[in-house]
């Protein structure tokens, strides 16, 4: 069996990726999130497939087909709740995974990092089109508001919006194509995940110290398979608790009302995992400026490797950078809170300051902190 595992063309790929993979001996639980994200993706694809068997992408029947799934399909309520809350778990793991990458300098593996940022954008796009499918009030108005942002693009904006809508408003054509996108994108994500892993396995994992781990590596199996399974069980317990005991905790009550183009909800807001970007969008009083800031809030991750000034890779031994990192984390929590509040004082000014500090910390303060720490580490004696 050992021989086959190492010689069979397919088994060899699996063996080199998940069994005999040399892994640093000191990677912490922060390195669990990659496998958790893989599991989230599998859960979402499977539950989504079963939902798609019963869902109809028509404006007249979409809302009632979701109700039918929850009421009449065997365990339909569970499948739907796991799928809806699985998206939240996906984003929790994503944010922690990206945060780990920033803290421990994983972004210096540039190919892996860049593919990861593109993956993040693709997952966000998938979640957005998926949120439109139940065709509730917030689905409809969320789709209307967010797609309308593209009209800020000079010259081609309005044409582009109507092209995406498939008409002059969000309607049947929009819902049908969003369902098509939502079905195909997870498989594109799956392919990109393979590329992400391919680039990662070219260099191997980083580790909490930021030092070269080649001198002390252990096989992935059994050490990290066991560790990943523990993380997986914890995640599944949290996901099932959420899906079974409070499935609507993270949703919007407006989505229990069927979509009505004649009635606007009092506060249009996206799902919680987009609120930080939505707050940045709203903090700029100009439409095009807001759209650019929204894009930059994610795309700024692409320039993080270029802004690395420290002689050390990880933040483990850099207290000033650590302080800035946790300030950035707090800042993102504030932005998430602001994104869910109405557009009135004091929320407007808090959102604007939080947006400015978000970009300032990443683009200006973190590189300066790296330079300062380098200076402080230089021997001062003659």
From Swiss-Prot:
Binds 2 heme b groups non-covalently. It is found in: Mitochondrion inner membrane. Heme b b566 binds at residues 97, 196. Heme b b562 binds at residues 83, 182. The chain crosses the membrane at residues 33-53, 77-98, 113-133, 178-198, 226-246, 288-308, 320-340, 347-367. GO terms for molecular function: metal ion binding; ubiquinol-cytochrome-c reductase activity. It is a multi-pass membrane protein. Heme 1 (or BL or b562) is low-potential and absorbs at about 562 nm, and heme 2 (or BH or b566) is high-potential and absorbs at about 566 nm. Belongs to the cytochrome b family. This is Cytochrome b. It comes from Philander mcilhennyi (Mcilhenny's four-eyed opossum). The lineage of its organism: Eukaryota, Metazoa, Chordata, Craniata, Vertebrata.
């Amino acid at each position: 069996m050992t021989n086959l595992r190492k010689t069979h063309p397919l088994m060899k790929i699996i063996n080199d990726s998940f069994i005999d993979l040399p892994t640093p001996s000191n990677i912490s639980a922060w390195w669990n999130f990659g496998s958790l994200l893989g599991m989230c993706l599998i859960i979402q694809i499977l539950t989504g497939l079963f939902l798609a068997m019963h869902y109809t992408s028509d404006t007249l029947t979409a809302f009632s087909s979701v109700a039918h799934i929850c009421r009449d399909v065997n365990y339909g309520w569970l499948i739907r709740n796991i799928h809806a809350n699985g998206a939240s778990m996906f984003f929790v793991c994503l944010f922690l995974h990206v945060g780990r990458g920033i803290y421990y300098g994983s972004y210096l593996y540039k190919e892996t990092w860049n593919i990861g940022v593109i993956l993040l954008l693709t997952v966000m796009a998938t979640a957005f089109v998926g949120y439109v499918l139940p065709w509730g009030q917030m689905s409809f108005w969320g789709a209307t508001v967010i797609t309308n942002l593209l009209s800020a693009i000079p010259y081609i904006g309005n044409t582009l919006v109507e092209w995406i809508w498939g008409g002059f408003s969000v309607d049947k054509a929009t819902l049908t194509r969003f369902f098509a996108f939502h079905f195909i994108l997870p498989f594109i994500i799956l392919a990109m995940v393979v590329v992400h892993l391919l680039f990662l396995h070219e260099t191997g994992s980083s580790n909490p110290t930021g030092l070269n781990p080649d001198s002390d590596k252990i096989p992935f199996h059994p050490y990290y398979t066991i560790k990943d399974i523990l993380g997986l069980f914890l995640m599944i317990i949290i996901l099932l608790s959420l899906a079974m005991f409070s499935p609507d905790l993270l949703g919007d009550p407006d989505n229990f009302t069927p979509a009505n183009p004649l009635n606007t909800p009092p506060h249009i807001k996206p799902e919680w995992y987009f609120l930080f970007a939505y707050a940045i969008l709203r903090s700029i009083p100009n439409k095009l400026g807001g759209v650019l800031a929204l894009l930059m809030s994610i795309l700024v991750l692409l320039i993080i490797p270029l802004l690395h000034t420290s002689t050390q890779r990880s933040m483990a031994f850099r207290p000033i950078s650590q302080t800035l990192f946790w300030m950035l984390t707090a800042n993102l929590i504030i932005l998430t809170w602001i994104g869910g509040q109405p557009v009135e004082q004091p929320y407007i000014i808090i959102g604007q300051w939080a947006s400015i500090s978000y970009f300032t910390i990443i683009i200006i303060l973190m590189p300066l902190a790296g330079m300062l720490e380098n200076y402080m580490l230089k021997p001062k004696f003659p």
